[in-house]
Amino acid sequence: NLIFIDASNCINRMRGKIRTSNEWPMVAFVRLYLTELLPNDIEKILYMDCDTIICDDICDLWNEDITEYNVAGVLDCMDDNYKEKIGLGIGHPYINSGVLLFNLNKLRDINIEKEFVDLVNKRGSCFKYPDQDVINVVMRDSIKVLPMKYNVVSQCLGFKYEEYVIYRNSSNYY
């Protein structure tokens, strides 16, 4: 089912809790409040950015077993220096937040919204992608990495396979 949710009350409450720059609108943080916005009987949710193009059946994605994870997503290319800067650490995956499968039961158990707010207010000024960075840092020990087919980002399409392997294995992109 496709459900539209009015998040205006949530956004108004966030304004008093989250300090953010004008560069990122408050609405970017709404997905951090999914457990508050959605009824308790919803156990899992598939989040997709509005610019996502679906080319095939997504049932396999929906049926991914995430019972032991907070979130599932596809790896994003992020250099190790940036991962360390945001407090993630080199050994942890960094996933793209454009397509995410959230385990709402696990997130409710750990009061995830408070962790999100605390991190944004403490370290948010060093984040390039605040909502994506927060998801990666807070959930770093409970991320399931999904196959790339579930979220192919455009920079992957401009490379030959050999070039992409070099790009992915680089420790310095600049």
Can you say where each PLM-predicted feature lies in the sequence?
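Active-site phosphate/pyrophosphate- and oxyanion-stabilizing loops and adjacent acidic/basic residues
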Residues: 32-36, 59, 133
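Short, surface-exposed amphipathic charged segments that create phosphate/polyanion-binding patches used
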Residues: 14-25, 86-90, 160-166
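Short aromatic/hydrophobic "clamp" motif used to bind/position activated sugar donors
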Residues: 45
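Active-site-proximal specificity loops/subdomain of glycosyltransferases
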Residues: 2-37
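Conserved PLP-enzyme active-site core in the AAT-like
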Residues: 42
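Catalytic core and acceptor-binding pocket of nucleotide-sugar-dependent glycosyltransferases
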Residues: 72-79, 92-174
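Catalytic metal- and UDP-sugar-binding loop of GT-A-like glycosyltransferases, i.e.
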Residues: 48
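Conserved donor-nucleotide/metal-binding helix-loop-beta segment in metal-dependent transferases, i.e.
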Residues: 52-85
